[in-house]
Each structure stands twice: as structure tokens, then as C-alpha cells.
Curated annotation (Swiss-Prot):
This is Large ribosomal subunit protein bL27. GO terms for molecular function: structural constituent of ribosome. It comes from Syntrophomonas wolfei subsp. wolfei (strain DSM 2245B / Goettingen). Residues 1-9 form a propeptide. One of its GO terms (cellular component) is cytosolic large ribosomal subunit. Keywords: Ribonucleoprotein, Ribosomal protein. GO terms for biological process: translation. InterPro entries: Ribosomal_bL27, Ribosomal_bL27_CS. The N-terminus is cleaved by ribosomal processing cysteine protease Prp. Pfam families: Ribosomal_L27. SUPFAM superfamilies: Ribosomal L27 protein-like. Belongs to the bacterial ribosomal protein bL27 family.
Length: 97
């Protein structure tokens, strides 16, 4: 007669993949033009997510919350109330001789 000798040995069933090993590209956010710098119309002043810094005089806000100058002038960072910041652009004083 036939006899079956069934033996089960340890073996590796499958190898899982690591959940690490990827990273998103940096978004290069932050202040691009600082207080006192001279800018031209259209220059980006701040790249941000949300309104950490609010637009002041002569500054507009883009669809992705980017702040940009709408006139040529000098950048000025100011407080807006107690806990908010804003950035404005003031026209350069023309000097006559």
C-alpha cells in the first residue's frame, strides 16, 4: 500500500514593499522680496499657502495666495492689527534737482 508522508516546511510566502522611499518636490514658498527692496509692477513678493501675510496698498493676491506688486516702488512689511501682517508697496519719491 501507499503511505503519504506529508511534511510542511517553513518557507517565505511573499515580500512586502517598503512604505518609505518617496518625497514630494519642495514648493519654494516664502518671502521673495524683503522690506526696503525696490520692485517693479508684477514682481512676486510672497509665495504662500493661505493668507499668512495679507495684501496691503498696491499689492494684489493671486489665485494660489501669492502676493505681487501692482506698481513700481519700495516694499514695506507692516502689522495689521495685533496679530496679522501685511505687505505694501509704496511709490518711490521722485527727486528733483
Amino acid at each position: 500500500m501507499f503511505t503519504f508522508d506529508l511534511q510542511l516546511f517553513a518557507h517565505k510566502k511573499g515580500v512586502g514593499s517598503s512604505k518609505n522611499g518617496r518625497d514630494s518636490q519642495s514648493k519654494r514658498l516664502g518671502v521673495k522680496r524683503y522690506d526696503g527692496q525696490i520692485v517693479t509692477a508684477g514682481n512676486i513678493l510672497v509665495r504662500q499657502r493661505g493668507t499668512k501675510i495679507h495684501p496691503g496698498q498696491n499689492v494684489m493676491i493671486g489665485g494660489d495666495d501669492t502676493l505681487f506688486a501692482i506698481i513700481d516702488g519700495r516694499v514695506k512689511f507692516e502689522r495689521k492689527g495685533r496679530d496679522k501682517k501685511q505687505v505694501s508697496v509704496y511709490p518711490l519719491e521722485t527727486m528733483t534737482m
